Curated annotation (Swiss-Prot):
Bias (Polar residues): 192-204
Family: Belongs to the universal ribosomal protein uL10 family.
Protein name from the UniProt record: Large ribosomal subunit protein uL10
Keyword annotations of the record: Ribonucleoprotein, Ribosomal protein, RNA-binding, rRNA-binding
A biological-process GO annotation: translation
Assembly and oligomerization: Part of the ribosomal stalk of the 50S ribosomal subunit. The N-terminus interacts with L11 and the large rRNA to form the base of the stalk. The C-terminus forms an elongated spine to which L12 dimers bind in a sequential fashion forming a multimeric L10(L12)X complex.
Function recorded in the entry: Forms part of the ribosomal stalk, playing a central role in the interaction of the ribosome with GTP-bound translation factors.
GO molecular function: large ribosomal subunit rRNA binding; structural constituent of ribosome
GO CC, any one term: large ribosomal subunit
Superkingdom per UniProt: Bacteria
Ranges for region Disordered: 170-204
């Protein structure tokens, strides 16, 4: 029968695997306690970094529906369960490993798919959520600025058009009134020879 503490540990790991947006497996052999504290601090609230036994991790992963981690569960293993920005945490682990070669990225899991070490490092090369949002906000701001310039230009163009029309009207009133005056005049008719002859007969 399994010990209650192991059952509880497996249940906790399973829940973390299931709820995490991604999980990165690392080897921490030789890292000091202070170095591990620094690593946890650098990851911030976006990830939970925990040491776990390979046997319990393997069971928990399978219960969470994750297959294919056996090759990564060799040697001392610590897992970074990411609940925030995946790219940011992956970048933090990659940078920490550069400064502390004793930390080795083994691989990971994302969306139920097992990743190798290179794939995890590629995640670190992606732009973080904050950077993407900043770029999006910058793009929207630029578009709004362009729209504002266009809308502000419309009234001024109309005003310039009216001003030009007023100047023309002052110089030549027919620009505005010509059409109206023409409409008040009676239309001229042209008499045909037959009509003239008929008029002459009547007069006789």
């Amino acid at each position: 029968m399994a010990r209650p503490d192991k059952v509880a540990a497996v249940a906790e790991l399973k829940e973390k695997f299931s709820s995490a947006g991604a999980t990165v497996l690392t080897e921490y052999r030789g890292l000091s306690v202070s170095a591990l504290k620094d690593l946890r601090r650098s990851l911030g609230s976006d990830a939970t970094y925990a040491v776990a036994k390979n046997t319990l991790t393997r069971i928990a992963a399978k219960e969470a529906g994750i297959e294919g981690l056996d090759d990564q569960l060799v040697g001392p293993t610590a897992l970074a369960f990411i609940n925030g920005d995946v790219a940011s945490v992956a970048k933090g682990l990659k940078n920490f490993a550069k400064d502390n070669p004793l930390l080795v990225i083994k691989g990971g899991v994302m969306d139920g798919n097992v990743l190798d070490a290179d794939q995890v490092k590629k995640l670190a090369d992606l732009e973080s959520r904050e950077v993407l949002l900043a770029k999006l906000a910058g793009g929207l701001k630029a578009n709004l600025t362009k729209a504002a310039v266009v809308f502000n230009a419309l009234p001024s163009k109309a005003a310039r058009g009216l001003g030009a029309l007023q100047e023309k009207a002052a110089a030549d009133p027919s620009v505005i009134g010509g059409a109206g005056e023409a409409s008040d005049q009676e239309p001229k008719t042209t008499e045909t020879p037959e009509a003239s002859a008929a008029q002459d007969n009547t007069n006789e």
